[in-house]
């Protein structure tokens, strides 16, 4: 036994020395979204924010529309920054940015990876930035083998052309695992024109539409995890261009907005089914086969120095209207206290939804937030959260209680649920961090309790880093997921290796694990069964304009009972990215 312990200690030491510096991209995305775990992020939102990391927003040159559509700032912060820029000129340091009303040092540290202080007034920066041309091209492919004799593959390609801040055009095609033939099964594309003189934009193709707090319209998935104060208030981006491989979460059609004094008018027409049009032969005629719908809508916003009021309306134009919603929202910042709310009404279902919340700084190192929700026959809820930062310790705590008017099960008369979570991060020394997350879910139906405990030990120094995760979950049964990860990153090359095992006997006990992948590919598998998995990820910048990303993984199930044995599965991914 002593020899085994010695071997384990030696292997762990060697593993530490061969580890790589942990990438900060996912940490930056987690921070700006206000979530604590990457497993809570939507893949579409990850892809959007990762693109901002690759191409930070040049806030000194950005228009009001660009600042708002980034989704990084509240309306108060946008107005405050534009007012500061008009009075004092361009912001030349992050310390100066933190001094702008609504921008604290804490907030600036969160958004710093996503913004740039590029200035045409500085030496070496061209004055004709508004006419500069940028090209982005990404090509990816993957091969997967599972059941003997069964092999699957996929691919994707996307391209974007951007001319200053006047024109942006993007297109993408992709084929998913399981799709028949070699032809792409998903298409996406869009063109955006901006006229800064008239404070107007036109978008054709795939676009995003996000207004208020999302009760009437917010395409894509919203972060519903209320585990930190930053996640409570949604920062509506209005209309913005979509650039993803599939465009499955985007709206498709025509949209535009224009600024008139303190008002911003946005109008759009979404056409679900437009991408599904097929050409078929009927007798001797060749006719299109489609099931196309038309969903027009608009948003009218009145904006002031400290916030905004807006009204959103959307409906589906058919003989029998299947959808029609109207909402009114407000968001204001009064002496550092954010107050916001939205009320919407579904004219078809005759249901209302109301939410109201606030977040504020209690004292140095402590911020609190609360949110009330009344969703007609769906749920009534109240949530409270706090974030603390004291010396070497920081974290969050939250409680979210919900009551469901319609019972979730015929076996109970009262449906109540309460979720609590506590996160603690301790910076032991400069290169060693300990993280712990404890969450509990109590409900009156189904499995009454769900307890999740996770700890992470993170080591990072120079070009070396390592992470050890230990996760145990108790619901119907008890499940475990553990892994060790390390790699190397220096100059133009980075390599990450991970080895883990899992024991999950019930689907209700599944544990999601974030896996490193290439840009635009968000990988969060649900661990289920009894097995081992190994992954290796590499990123290589082979030229000033080109990068190669590679990922290989293998999952086996050697610990499964004989009657449930299943074969392992292997996957290989390659992706080239060119920027010129």
Model-assigned labels for residue ranges:
Residues 239-245, 286-290, 523-527:
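Extracellular/periplasm-exposed beta-strand and loop segments of Gram-negative cell-envelope proteins
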